[in-house]
Amino acid sequence: MLKRHLNVQAFFDDYAERSTDALKNPPVEDIDGVVASFAPFFVESSPRGVMGGENGPDFRKAIPQGFAHYREVGGKAMRITAVKVTEIDDANVMATVDWAFDYVRPKDGKAGTVNFTNRYFLNIVNGKPKIFAYITPDEEKAMQEHGLV
């Protein structure tokens, strides 16, 4: 059990590092690493509704667009402040991940942080976690509250 928790922690540490690297100027985007983090199909649930998709060419194209959006609003880093792993069964866990999105607002140079929590459902086969579902809060609302959009 401890090894699985450590694997999930390392998985999200790598995920955060890839995200922060993609916010640098110039960006270093590890698209293959992001793609490899997800199962062949995955589901997102948010206040906008539930969406599902294939981990395929369209997803691969959307990744750099998402990072570009975060850079446009002043994103500088994606940091993990906590990870709590809940065992579901022998092959699946839920990870509650507390994130800190650090930014410098383009319009006035003010620095700040958007804190939020995502819940990820991961399937672990041969020690390799893959995200097959996640629940996220209202990202657009949080960005509006911080004057980023």
What is the meaning of each model-derived region?
Residues M1-G33:
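Juxtamembrane and targeting peptides
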Residues I80-T86, A100-F101, F116-N123:
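Hydrophobic/aromatic beta-strand elements that line small-molecule binding cavities or substrate pockets
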Residues L2-L6, E29-A91:
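A solvent-exposed, acidic/Ser-Thr-rich amphipathic alpha-helical stretch
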Residues T113-L148:
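Short beta-strand edge/turn micro-motifs at domain boundaries
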Residues D90-F101:
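A short hydrophobic beta-strand element
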Residues E72-V73, F101-T113:
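Short, cysteine-centered beta-strand-loop-beta hairpins and adjacent loop/turn segments enriched
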Residues F38, W99-F101, I135-P137:
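Short beta-strand segments enriched in hydrophobic/aromatic residues
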